A protein has these predicted regions:
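Active-site loop/oxyanion-hole signature of alpha/beta-hydrolase fold enzymes
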Residues: 2-43, 54, 78-79, 83-84, ...
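Alpha/beta-hydrolase active-site loop signature
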Residues: 6-10, 72, 238-239
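Conserved hydrolase catalytic core segment
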Residues: 38-81
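Flexible "cap/lid" loop of the alpha/beta hydrolase fold
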Residues: 66-114, 118-123
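Hydrophobic, aromatic-rich cap/lid helix
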Residues: 125-187, 203
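Conserved loop-alpha-helix segment in the C-terminal half of the alpha/beta-hydrolase fold
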Residues: 190-236
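Catalytic histidine-centered segment of alpha/beta-hydrolase-like enzymes
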Residues: 234-246
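Post-His helix in hydrolase/transferase enzymes
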Residues: 243-255
């Protein structure tokens, strides 16, 4: 088993010029061909699923493909502006890069994340001040650890796993739409010929029409129509399935007959 840090994450190259699906996909293909040296079962979560789809559609390096809640269609072109990722992480990354007061992106993101807008006006200011101060104390004491904040939901803290080594310029690539290198997601999916499994997290739409998920049901149907070899498993949880439902996640990978179409 190989765990690969894509550019802009972990210990990988932090070069903003490489933050696009072509450069990252080709890097993964090179790694498989020159290090693993045989076709692999490739799993990609979120934007990693877009990269994995590129690998599967542009090489014979992938024998089995697992797409964990990948944001097909919803994060590209004008539609991206109506997704939670755009108004949250991508916009916060953009704002962080255009200011010089705060140097700690983890703390900046916690303080500016979109979720604060879901709190009532009566409680938001007090809670924001108190919890941001708590986050700042934790960051000062444990700068190399994943953020922990008392009373903050576990699912909400999942986003901070590995954020210490996250380059906000990666999020900026989704803000500007440059990540996709002008490759339509339809073209990525049409080229996939290997057995494929899509792991779908819960779909939620906000009262304002904002997509509070990585893709909606219509997007999912489009994925399944474009990839005849794709099967589907749903999970009643948020975006980070492998963190929120680890046992069910592993069970799905170990027991499901990937490639056998399952009715929605």
């Amino acid at each position: 088993m190989y765990a690969v840090d894509c550019y802009g994450h972990g210990g990988s190259l932090h070069d903003a010029l490489k933050y696009n699906v072509v450069d990252m996909g080709n890097a993964v293909i090179y790694f498989i061909q020159n290090v693993v040296k045989e076709p692999v079962c490739l799993l990609g979560h979120s934007s990693g699923g877009l990269i994995a789809a590129y690998v599967a559609s542009h090489s014979d390096s992938c024998s089995t493909l697992v797409l964990e809640d990948a944001p097909f269609f919803s994060c590209q072109d004008e539609r991206r502006k109506h997704s939670f990722n755009y108004v949250d992480l991508s916009t916060v990354c953009h704002a962080f890069l255009n200011q010089n007061e705060e140097t700690d992106f983890v703390l900046y993101y916690f303080s500016h994340q979109r979720i604060w807008e879901l709190f009532s006006e009566k409680s938001k200011e007090k809670l924001h001040s108190k919890l941001t101060a708590s986050a700042a104390r934790y960051r000062k004491k444990h700068p190399d650890k994943n953020l922990r904040v008392p009373f903050w939901p576990k699912a909400g803290l999942a986003a901070y796993q590995g954020m210490n080594h996250y380059d906000p310029r990666f999020g900026e690539a989704f803000y500007t739409d440059s990540f996709h290198a002008e490759i339509a997601h339809e073209d990525l999916l049409r080229g996939i010929r290997c057995k494929t499994l899509f792991l779908k997290a819960r779909t939620e739409i906000g009262q304002d029409g904002l997509l509070m998920a990585t893709l909606d049901e219509e997007d999912l149907r489009h994925v399944l129509n474009l990839v005849p070899t794709c099967s589907l498993i749903r999970f009643d949880c948020g975006h980070a399935i492998h963190i929120e439902k680890p046992k069910a996640f592993v069970s799905a990978l170990c027991t499901y007959d990937i490639g056998q179409r399952k009715e929605m």
